[in-house]
Amino acid sequence: MASKERVGVVIRNPQEKTVIVAVNNRVRHNKYSKIIIRTKKYQVHDHSHICKLGDEVKISEVKPISKTKRWIISEVLSSTVNPEKFGD
């Protein structure tokens, strides 16, 4: 079974090896057919401190690292994204 991957933006850097990544998902409303953007936040393990606020990153699902962390940073895609558009 392949691990799940998501692309999102780093919106917070609260602890030493943890970052919060916001991932946007576009879904169509069943009744009104309007496209809705849903945002989900993931706590992601950043062991080597490669992420900064606003970086666009790819995250991969792994076995549980702690109570709430089940994702790690796979790669940093770009560092020019504005984190304000994802909200906090």
From Swiss-Prot:
UniProt entry keywords in alphabetical sequence: Cyanelle, Plastid, Ribonucleoprotein, Ribosomal protein, RNA-binding, rRNA-binding
Compartments reported by the entry: Plastid, Cyanelle
MF GO annotations: rRNA binding; structural constituent of ribosome
GO process annotations (BP): translation
Domain of life: Eukaryota
GO cellular component terms listed in the entry, alphabetical order: cyanelle; cytosolic small ribosomal subunit
Record's subunit section: Part of the 30S ribosomal subunit.
NCBIfam families: PRK05610.1, uS17_bact
Role of this protein: One of the primary rRNA binding proteins, it binds specifically to the 5'-end of 16S ribosomal RNA.
Family assignment from sequence similarity: Belongs to the universal ribosomal protein uS17 family.
Protein name, UniProt field: Small ribosomal subunit protein uS17c
